[in-house]
Regions:
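Conserved oxyanion/phosphate-binding beta-strand-loop segments in alpha/beta enzyme cores
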Residues: 240-280
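Alpha-helical support elements that line or immediately flank enzyme active sites
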Residues: 282-307
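Solvent-exposed loop and edge beta-strand segments that line ligand/cofactor-binding
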Residues: 93, 197-202, 275-291
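Terminal accessory carbohydrate-recognition/targeting modules of carbohydrate-active enzymes
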Residues: 1-250, 304-307
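Generic hydrophobic-segment detector
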Residues: 39, 78, 167, 252, ...
């Protein structure tokens, strides 16, 4: 979460099980006016001419995407990390959301001791709609190159900037889906949804050599790309969390995890220039103020030094 009401929420295998899950749900006005910018990335890895889809997603009327079959491990040690294995090639993906911004940064690394011709294609699954609303199929989305490695994607009401060390390839706009949201169907919510794809980011590399990481930064602000950008954003997040832990002054590992877990629900409230608490993700909004109705639920925030 980003402390504004925005969030990045995918399943352990990197799929969407609910329509309100998103790779980047931005907060237009903290914390309740939220925009669903990008649902996910369609990730395709090509090795020596053979394509492998790394994305996982249940679909309604077509075969499911089963990238989880190549998923070797998932870990969450401060940030989520997915590791895929195809033959002797290992593809790792790390992701971080910047606190106080509508920014998600991803870093891919492709490694093998053997020589292979590899290509990674990342296709944004764009939604560009208010949270809880469907994608408007009549919406026109344009893609412009702002400068080297910085791209501007504009919809009817939204602008998304992508800074990446990858080449852009535009394609005819087409709908992706419908996707099947199994958890929503169980709860009686809308069980399907679509996104739109207009372009891809492509990076080609040869394994067995010194390799650069593939970095993709998705944001509502334009970042000038440089090779250390992902690390800067990661260190920014880590510094914020270290400050929280220092303030809480807890020594037990469980207590320190509680500090970071509780922080996910503390958000800015723009209308009062103060803080509020989100009742839960991805459905709920904030309680707006502290009162007797909700006070019994604040014990975790008292214990972690957030009150």
């Amino acid at each position: 979460t980003n402390g504004l009401g925005g969030y990045s929420s995918l399943s352990v295998i990197g799929s969407l099980a609910r329509g309100d899950q998103a790779l980047l749900m931005s907060a237009q006005k903290a914390p309740n006016v939220r925009r669903h910018l990008i649902s996910n990335l369609l990730e395709t890895f090509s090795m020596d001419g053979t394509d492998y889809v790394l994305t996982s997603q249940r679909m309604m009327n077509q075969p499911d995407l089963e990238g989880f079959r190549y998923l070797d491990s998932f870990s969450y040690d401060k940030i989520p990390t997915w590791t895929y294995r195809i033959g002797d090639v290992v593809i790792s993906k790390r992701m971080v959301m910047v606190h106080g911004e509508n920014t998600v940064a991803l870093q891919y690394n492709i490694h093998s001791e053997q020589k292979h011709q590899c290509r990674l294609t990342l296709t944004p699954m764009l939604r560009f709609s208010p949270k809880k609303e469907e994608f408007c199929e009549k919406q026109q989305i344009t893609v412009n190159i702002e400068q080297d490695n910085l791209y501007r994607i504009k919809g009817a009401e939204d602008v998304l900037y992508v800074a990446a060390n990858a080449q852009i390839q535009e394609e005819p706009s087409h709908l992706f889906g419908p996707m099947y949201f199994s958890q929503d169907e169980r709860d009686g919510r809308e069980k399907q949804g679509r996104t739109v794809c207009t372009h891809s980011y492509i990076s080609e590399t040869e394994t067995g050599e010194i390799q650069n990481d593939i970095n993709v930064i998705l944001s509502t602000k334009p970042y000038t790309y440089h090779e250390g950008l992902f690390d800067e954003l990661l260190h920014s997040r880590q510094a914020y969390e270290e400050a929280l832990l220092k303030k809480a002054n807890l020594t037990s590992e469980i207590g320190r995890q509680l500090v970071l877990g509780a922080d996910a629900y503390v958000v800015d409230r723009e209308s009062t220039q103060g803080k509020s608490i989100i009742a839960g993700y991805p459905f709920f909004e904030d309680w707006g103020r502290y009162d007797d109705r909700t006070g019994r639920n604040y014990s975790g925030h008292r214990q972690t030094g957030r009150m």
